[in-house]
Regions:
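N-terminal extension/subdomain marker
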Residues: 21-134, 395
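Short acidic, gly/pro-rich beta-turn/loop elements at beta-sheet edges
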Residues: 45-47, 80-82, 149, 221, ...
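Catalytic-core segments of thiol-dependent peptidases
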Residues: 75-82, 88-102, 113-204, 213-214, ...
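Terminal, contiguous helix-loop blocks that mediate binding/assembly
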Residues: 26-28, 165-408
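C-terminal motif of bacterial Sec signal peptides marking the signal peptidase cleavage site
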Residues: 16-19
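Structural recognition of the beta-strand scaffold that forms the well-ordered cores
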Residues: 34-38, 69-74, 138-141, 207-211, ...
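Hydrophobic helical h-region of N-terminal Sec-dependent signal peptides
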Residues: 10-14
Length: 408
């Protein structure tokens, strides 16, 4: 893949120039911490992602001389056009010697017409590893997303037998962000990075992974990614297009010896909870990936004991994470499902202990649009529907299902 890259002579000149002016030379060697931002915005989110990047640059940023670095992979539309090529680029974001933020282009991927693919993401992350070898990596991906559900699948597919929606007038809600997609020519033709491809695209283990994507807070996604990261920050509902919190992102990830992921989740929750009307809509979950196996064991015990109670009618009574007019109606609260399956007191105690360890923090606004959020544990799960043969077959390929056998 052809790329325009800065040549080493320029880097050498920068070092010499810094030395001649009494400035600290740029850091070389193995970095302590590298934060990677991936903004897949060649879609209707392009303007929002540009604003997020500007907010990130307003934060406390490391300087070139420090052993910490912020790297941003960005792919946006050109003036909102889905037909005009605009090559993605890799930037280094840092605080210059004058105190102002700098976005320095490291690489432009001229031949990468589609960034929403396993191959493209792997290329970029391999480049980051090569340019910035580090003891610790953290990553945030921002784009559309549908959790574990295939990107092109909606509730109307397969003509499944589901509970009819209550008759209600259509309401115009604020736009949300639906792991990663790109519009090819028009918004009706989107290419997605499916969950398992996303997992395959990450070449190194990261300390934390923040997904600024809709509906990422499902146990199926978390379990699929558990061996790639120590912690996940995800949302079981959709996310408004303003996205995660970016004006304090870098300081909370890099301002001390350890990333303060709980404080970041609290900042996200407070940002949305302080709004009013339909904009007061947000959920956030912090997952300790090392505790997911214990959660699977506790949930599997409930499922094995009460499988006969696993009926499609539960989709009408279990706490949902999708609002009534959504066309993605596959996300239900894991704990509430266990309770409605008829779990015993002992089984619920074991599940609650596993959830407390696995989900050290979660928070929800009182509602998301017109969906009341009343019985939430922070993780969603699928309730199988017999009429969805294709979706159920897809579910069988997930690591979570291999562990708990929800779909048989």
């Amino acid at each position: 893949m052809l790329r325009r890259t800065k040549i080493s002579l320029i880097a050498l000149a920068v070092v010499l120039f810094a030395g001649c002016n009494g400035m600290d030379p740029p850091f070389t060697g193995t970095f302590e911490h590298v934060f990677i931002y991936c903004g897949l915005g060649y879609n209707n989110l392009s303007g929002n992602l540009k604003a997020n990047l500007e907010d990130m640059q307003s934060d406390l940023l490391p300087g070139l001389w420090q052993d910490k670095a912020v790297v941003a992979f960005c792919h946006n539309t050109l003036n909102g056009s889905y037909t005009t090529p605009n090559p993605p680029c890799l930037l280094r974001i840092y605080r210059g010697s004058d105190g102002k933020p700098v976005a320095d282009t490291l690489t432009t991927y001229d031949n990468m017409s589609v960034s929403a693919s396993k191959e493209a993401l792997r290329t970029v992350l391999d480049d980051v590893r090569g340019m910035f070898p580090a003891k610790h990596y953290g990553m945030l991906l921002s784009s559309h997303g549908t959790g574990w559900v295939p990107g092109r699948y909606t509730s109307s597919d397969e003509n499944a037998v589901t509970l009819a929606r209550a008759s209600r007038p259509m309401v115009s809600w604020p736009e949300t962000k639906a792991v990663g997609n790109q519009y090819i020519g028009s918004s009706k033709n989107a290419q997605w990075i499916e969950l398992q491809d996303f997992a395959d695209a990450i070449p190194m283990k990261v300390d934390y992974l923040i997904l600024d994507n809709c509906l990422s807070g499902c146990v199926e996604l978390a379990y699929e990614l558990k061996d790639l990261c120590d912690y996940l920050v995800i949302s079981p509902t959709e996310i408004l297009t303003s996205g995660m919190v970016y004006d304090r992102l870098v300081r909370l990830m890099m301002g001390s010896n350890q990333p303060d992921l709980k404080a970041y989740c609290e900042a996200y929750y407070n940002f949305y909870n302080e709004k009013s009307g339909s904009l007061r809509s947000g959920t956030i979950t912090l997952v300790d990936c090392a505790k997911l196996d214990a959660l699977a064991e506790a949930f599997s015990a409930v499922l094995d004991a009460h499988r006969d109670a696993l009926q499609p009618g539960l989709t009408g009574t279990v706490q949902r994470y999708y609002y009534p007019s959504s066309n993605l109606r596959f996300y239900y609260d894991l704990r509430d499902l266990a309770a409605q399956l008829g779990a015993t007191g002992a089984e619920m105690s074991a599940l609650d202990a596993a959830l407390a360890a696995c989900v050290p923090y979660h928070a929800e606004t009182p509602s998301f649009f017109d969906l009341q959020l009343e019985r939430c544990c922070g993780l969603s799960i699928y309730i199988p529907e017999p009429g969805r043969k294709q979706l159920n077959n897809q579910y069988k390929t997930l690591s979570w299902n291999n562990r708990v056998r929800l779909v048989q």
